[in-house]
């Protein structure tokens, strides 16, 4: 028998989490949101870093998934703002990019990204990353 703490975070009866998806591409936002919602996460979406920062100020967010390159405030700027914030500094941030440049991942690591994924990302890779990060946050909280 599986206890609630042994169940995958996104499964029915599990604690889940509220995830903020940030991407300027509406199709990408919709696809990522759908993957997460099917796994029973509460998903909010923003079109850029500025909008995401407003959402972070207004709601409890457990994890942020952000595109690296966006107009207005890009994912790297959002990551820096989150890491410098006393309130949000511990929120896991997953950086997404369409580029395969190794330097993109190195830069995200240097700025404090919790994980770095390359688009297109599979549902399995996304959900495994999210569950690992949320479980780590729950343990350290």
Model-identified regions with their sequence ranges:
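Short, glycine/charged-rich "phosphate-handling" switch motifs in NTP-dependent
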Residues: 114
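Active-site beta3 strand of CheY-like receiver
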Residues: 59-65
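Receiver (REC) domain active-site loop signature in two-component systems and cognate sites
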Residues: 70
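Charged docking surfaces used in two-component/phosphorelay signaling
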Residues: 30-38
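Short hydrophobic/Thr-rich beta-strand motif most characteristic of the beta2 strand and flanking loop
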Residues: 40-47, 55
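C-terminal output helix
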Residues: 121-131
């Amino acid at each position: 028998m599986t206890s609630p703490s042994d169940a995958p975070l996104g499964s029915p009866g599990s604690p889940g989490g509220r995830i903020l998806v940030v991407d300027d591409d509406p199709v990408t936002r919709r696809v990522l949101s759908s993957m997460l919602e099917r796994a029973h996460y509460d998903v909010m979406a923003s079109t850029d870093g500025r909008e995401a920062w407003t959402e972070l100020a207004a709601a409890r967010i457990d994890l942020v998934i952000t595109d690296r390159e966006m107009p207005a405030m890009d994912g790297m700027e959002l990551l820096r703002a989150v890491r410098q914030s006393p309130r949000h500094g511990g929120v896991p941030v997953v950086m997404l990019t369409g580029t395969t440049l190794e330097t993109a991942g190195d830069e995200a690591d240097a700025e404090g990204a919790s994980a770095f994924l390359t688009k297109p990302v599979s549902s399995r890779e996304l959900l495994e990353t999210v569950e690992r990060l949320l479980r780590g946050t729950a343990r350290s909280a």
